[in-house]
From Swiss-Prot:
GO biological process, one term: protoporphyrinogen IX biosynthetic process
GO-annotated molecular function: glutamate-1-semialdehyde 2,1-aminomutase activity; pyridoxal phosphate binding; transaminase activity
Species, as recorded: Coxiella burnetii (strain CbuK_Q154)
NCBIfam families xref list: hemL, PRK00062.1
UniProt entry keywords in alphabetical sequence: Cytoplasm, Isomerase, Porphyrin biosynthesis, Pyridoxal phosphate
Domain of life: Bacteria
Listed cofactors: pyridoxal 5'-phosphate
PANTHER family: GLUTAMATE-1-SEMIALDEHYDE 2,1-AMINOMUTASE, GLUTAMATE-1-SEMIALDEHYDE 2,1-AMINOMUTASE 1, CHLOROPLASTIC-RELATED
Protein name: Glutamate-1-semialdehyde 2,1-aminomutase
CDD domains: OAT_like
Sites bearing N6-(pyridoxal phosphate)lysine, chain numbering: 266
Gene that produces this protein: hemL
Principal EC category: isomerase
Signal peptide residues on this chain, from the entry's feature table: none
Length: 435
């Protein structure tokens, strides 16, 4: 029973659009009643109806240590005692900036903001200001936040301008946003051939987290780096999801590619609202007050958020942190796949350290957006609700990645696998491949 969640959801819809403050939370993609959470600890969520869930959302990625980690809570509590916001510099800003640069050497200077959207939006403004060019290239299926210039659908052909994907976004705002195909270098090269003198930057997720985790092919990212070098454009990695999750140095360290700018978020705030963008010194020096490109924020560098973020990043330096996280992720995903195969369930998966994507499809590998959107959404909805009913909380969307934390143990992973095995063994026939 979810009586209290249902009552709160009904009440919330009187005061907030859709009853939520971020659309995916409304369960619109899966149906049913969104769970209202009252407490979280380690790998678990507890809702207002006192039901406990193994959590594979992790607040959409920030909670790499698990919920309510003692070191993070202590750091935030100590910071709160000194005040919630100063509107002035604090020492922890310097400490966090230095640690970010230590983890990601491509970031020689960094600017703190309050969200991933602010980070990508500001990085693009900086790229345009530095290059004196107006156009940017993004990729179909990659999500970089809700800034107007990034809410774009692909046009009717590879060389067309983008079209707004949301009412309220003026056509003129997105006409400088060019859309290419992820993992298709030829589509990018074609845009450069036509608009070579106008392209300020490419922005890309090195591992795309909002089309159910599709990693870039290594030669694809290498090719993007080479095209940017050739045409004098900047390469921006959106590592809001992957930064400090897939590796201490982010996805860029796995691919051994140095972007000009990097957008960060989620983990760097330890669960607090934080984003950041940084990169080469000579580029970052063009930001005000040193340079002419303006960007500011009342709550940027908030002392409580800086303390929580600093405490989180320090924990990531523990011995074998990432090898242990990767091992747990692999145990979970390979266990799911083996159970799906045994039950003849059409399922494939992509995963990296601490993050995974499940797609109900008979295709063995999913490497393109077109493949991801052709996954069976109805199968996912059924799977999602069966998991939820059995105490496992997944992202309420067939296109969102799942996350696993350092707080998850083999106990939680194995319990999850037992639940999945049972679900697959009794699932409706429409979940099975014909044999």
């Amino acid at each position: 029973m979810v009586d209290h969640s249902a009552a709160l959801f009904n009440k919330a819809q009187n005061y907030m659009p859709g009853g939520v403050n971020s659309p995916v939370r409304a369960f619109g993609a899966v149906g049913g009643v969104p769970r209202f959470i009252k407490k979280a600890s380690g790998p678990y969520l507890i809702d207002v109806d006192e039901k406990k869930y193994i959590d594979y959302v992790g607040s959409w990625g920030p909670m790499i240590l698990g919920h309510a980690h003692p070191a993070v809570i202590q750091a935030a509590q100590e910071a709160v005692q000194n005040g919630l916001s100063f509107g002035a510099p604090c020492e922890n800003e310097i400490k966090l900036a230095a640690l970010i640069g230590e983890f990601m050497p491509s970031i020689e200077k960094v600017r703190m903001v309050n969200s991933g959207t602010e980070a990508t939006m500001s990085a693009l403004r900086l790229a345009r200001g530095v290059t004196g060019r107006s156009k940017i290239i993004k990729f179909e299926g990659c999500y970089h936040g809700h800034a107007d210039c990034l809410l774009v659908n692909a046009g009717s052909g590879a060389l067309t301008f983008g079209m707004p994907s949301s009412p309220g976004v003026p056509l003129g705002t997105v006409q400088d946003t060019l859309t290419a195909t992820f993992n298709d270098l030829d589509s990018v090269a074609a845009l450069f051939e036509k608009y070579s003198k106008d392209i300020a930057a490419i922005i890309v997720e090195p591992i795309a987290g909002n089309m159910n985790l599709i990693p870039a092919a290594p030669d694809f990212l290498t090719g993007l780096r080479e095209l940017c070098n050739q045409y004098g454009s900047l390469l921006i990695f959106d590592e809001v999801i992957t930064g400090f999750r897939v590796a201490k140095g982010g996805a860029q360290s796995l691919y051994n590619i140095r972007p000009d700018l990097t957008a960060l978020g989620k983990i760097i705030g330890g669960g607090m609202p934080v984003g950041a963008y940084g990169g080469r010194r000579e580029i970052m020096n063009q930001l005000s007050p040193e340079g002419p490109v303006y960007q500011a924020g009342t709550l940027s560098g908030n002392p409580v958020a800086m303390a929580a973020g600093l405490a989180t990043l320090k924990e990531l330096t523990a011995e074998n942190f990432y090898s242990n996280l990767k091992e747990k992720t692999e145990r979970l995903v390979m266990g799911i796949l083996s159970r799906a195969k045994a039950a003849k369930i059409p399922l494939t998966a992509n995963f990296s350290c601490g993050i995974f994507g499940l797609i109900f499809t008979s295709e063995e590998r999913v490497t393109r957006y077109a493949q991801a959107v052709n996954g069976n959404v109805e199968h996912f909805r059924s799977f999602f609700h069966k998991m939820l009913d059995n105490g496992v909380y997944l992202a309420p969307s067939a296109f969102e990645s799942g996350f696993i934390s350092a707080a998850h143990t083999n106990k939680e992973v194995d319990k999850t696998l037992d639940i999945i095995e049972n679900i697959f063994s009794v699932s409706e026939t429409y979940l099975r491949i014909s044999v």
